[in-house]
Amino acid sequence: CDNISKLTFKNVKYETHLENIKMDEYKLQNMTKILPVSIYVEDSDPDGFNGIDMSESIRAQVETYPIMKKYFDEMENKYQWVICAMPSMEWAKKVFPNDKPKEAFKKLEEAILKTTRIDKDAIKNWKEHVKELQEKAKILNEYNFDYLEYKSSNGTDLKIKLMPNHSWLSARETTLGSNVEFTANMPTEEVFTMPSYEGVDGLVVSTKPLSFRG
């Protein structure tokens, strides 16, 4: 998949990207009708897009987003979905650089099973985990913060204003209409809310390997 994407970014022109996006629109049209349960599985190379110029593709995506947005809005919170990851050799070598490729792959596989809480009693583990996250979200809602401030000895100094009447949510989501509960990300450790895009000021320093657009 990464290799196909590389060829696309390297060789496909802006006008062709616009044509290809019509296929994505057709797919979204059908998704809004059937609202399928979706499982997204990733196993990509963290450095897969190093040195690749994606400007043509990004420009096409930005231009066509207003067309796509109506479909995203139509489906929002109406269907169940989950994103999870499978190990790849490239990813495994990044995480376990001192091990042989097959051993690194096995270690990453075991780490994913553990962090996604499916190595033992998965249903019990997730019920307990979701309950804990929901309790933390409840506490944050009771505090009703105006802003969040992050400071660290590594140089991070960031202030983020929150939207008025914001609400903290956690791993458990419920579909609109059908009222089906689901967890969208595996793993997930987050509680989250809505910041103000005009109220972010400061600097963030990454202390871990960071993959940004490959």
Q: What are the residue ranges of the model-derived segments?
A:
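Active-site bordering "gate/hinge" segments
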Residues: 1-200
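Long, well-ordered mid-to-C-terminal structural blocks that present hydrophobic/aromatic surfaces
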Residues: 194-214
